Amino acid sequence: MKIEKLTPEREAQIAVYRDRYFALATSTERADRPRAEAAARAMAEIAGVKVNSVVWAATPQDGQREYENAWASLRASLGASLRASLWASLWASLWASLRDSLRDSDWTAFYIYAQEQLAVVYDERSANVLRLHNEIAASCFALWIAPGTVILCERPTKCEVVGGKLVNVEWE
């Protein structure tokens, strides 16, 4: 059934979801590490990545650095003759698995709203990925998946919001 117009009640719920996800994005509560790690491992499994380690980063910059180091380590460990073909195959496989879920990660609130308020039904895999994105959003700041590892980022220690806009973020 196609929805042409939202009812006033459903329209009012948009602000509730926006506020909920803005609060999650600007939360300075410590990460719920067990919850985040469980969701991250499940996301990696969906992507076909066997997780050997979980790394916690203090800042997004540290997380990005860990992610780049994980990929650099893999490239360095491969012999030159094997590197190109294995790299292309691994990257294509990982990207194909993650592309759809990661591309829209900023839209978690939109898809959750549609699921909960508009009774949109997603296929089982998509619903599971959405649930896991929601778990990540509710439990830590960010997630990176690399070969053999997942990297999670702790939440900031300070988020300054002025007039509904984020103006300053600090990490320890």
Walk through the language-model features, giving the residues of each.
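Short, glycine-biased loop/turn motifs at secondary-structure junctions and
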Residues: 1-172
